[in-house]
Swiss-Prot record:
Residues 33-49, 123-137 have a biased composition (Low complexity). GO terms for cellular component: nucleus. Keywords: Chemotaxis, Developmental protein, Differentiation, DNA-binding, Homeobox, Nucleus. One of its GO terms (biological process) is regulation of transcription by RNA polymerase II. One of its GO terms (molecular function) is RNA polymerase II cis-regulatory region sequence-specific DNA binding. This is Homeobox protein ceh-36. Residues 55-117 bind DNA. Expressed in ASE and AWC chemosensory neurons. Expressed left-right asymmetrically in the embryo, in the grandmother cell and the mother cell to the MI pharyngeal motorneuron but in neither analogous precursors of the e3D neuron. PROSITE patterns: HOMEOBOX_2. CDD domains: homeodomain. Belongs to the paired homeobox family. SUPFAM superfamilies: Homeodomain-like. The keyword Ubl conjugation does not apply.
């Protein structure tokens, strides 16, 4: 016989198990507190964005008149005191509490002035400097008169060109006259006018070959005279040249006396 499980073990309330009822009662409020905390933390995101935006400083832009006043004070002193900065803020109509902006402007202006001096030291010819708003100042042009440079179109340039042309024309006419005189002059006069080559004695050249050639020429022109060679050799000095093949040389000439 099968018994029904649900009829054998009926459902029991929390009164039968008091420990489980306490646990259920404690867990329910925690869930509600978590949900409420999540709902309360959600609207804080826009407040943080507004806080970051409020921490940013607003950029101050000066007009031309204000920049002229600042540059004037900067030329007088690069480190104005507090009273001077406050008076300058009132002069350029800055709102109250913006004196710090003038301090920052002077700091940036001093840094820019140092950079300009460094650039002038590296490039001495460049004297261009710019103001705080980026507009260039008037550049000082070099004195061309002291350098002796004449700009085309000026009276100095025209006078210099005319004098140079006259000098070149005078030199050219003088050269043409010399060429004409040389063409008209006869050849004999030209040869006489040429300088004679100087004969120089060369110590390294020997005079012995010249003396030998002269002596040989004089010897060849004179008639030879007979010379008796037999006086130096005895009559029986030579071998017998004719006769039989078997011959004995005559050695009597070599025998001792």
């Amino acid at each position: 016989m099968t018994t029904n499980f649900y009829t054998a073990f009926p459902t029991l309330g929390y009164t039968a198990y008091p420990q489980f009822a306490f646990a259920a009662a404690t867990t329910a409020p925690s869930l509600t507190s978590a949900t409420t905390s999540s709902t309360t933390m959600a609207p804080m995101a826009p407040n943080s964005e507004s806080g970051r935006r409020a921490g940013r400083r607003e950029r101050t832009s000066f007009n031309r008149g204000q920049l002229d006043q600042l540059e004037k004070v900067f030329r007088e002193t690069q480190y104005p005191d507090v009273h001077r900065r406050e008076a300058l803020a009132k002069a350029i109509n800055l709102p109250d509490g913006r004196v710090q902006v003038i301090t920052v402007w002077f700091k940036n202006r001093r840094a820019k002035d140092r950079n300009n001096k460094k650039m002038d030291g590296v490039h001495p010819g460049s004297t261009s400097s710019r103001s705080s708003n980026g507009s260039p100042h008037n550049e000082s042009k070099p004195d061309t008169k002291s350098l002796g440079i004449h700009i085309p179109g000026t009276p100095e340039f025209n006078a210099h060109s005319a004098a140079k042309y006259e000098a070149n024309s005078a030199v050219l006419s003088q050269l043409q006259q010399q060429q004409q005189q040389q063409l008209q002059q006869p050849k004999s006069e030209l040869e006489d006018s040429k300088p004679l080559a100087d004969t120089k004695y060369d110590s390294t050249q020997s005079l012995l070959p010249q003396a030998q050639a002269a002596a040989y020429a004089s010897y060849a022109t004179t008639a030879p005279y007979p010379y008796n060679y037999n006086s130096y050799f005895p009559s029986n000095f030579y071998y017998q040249q004719y006769g039989s093949n078997d011959y004995t040389p005559n050695i009597t000439a070599y025998s001792p006396l």
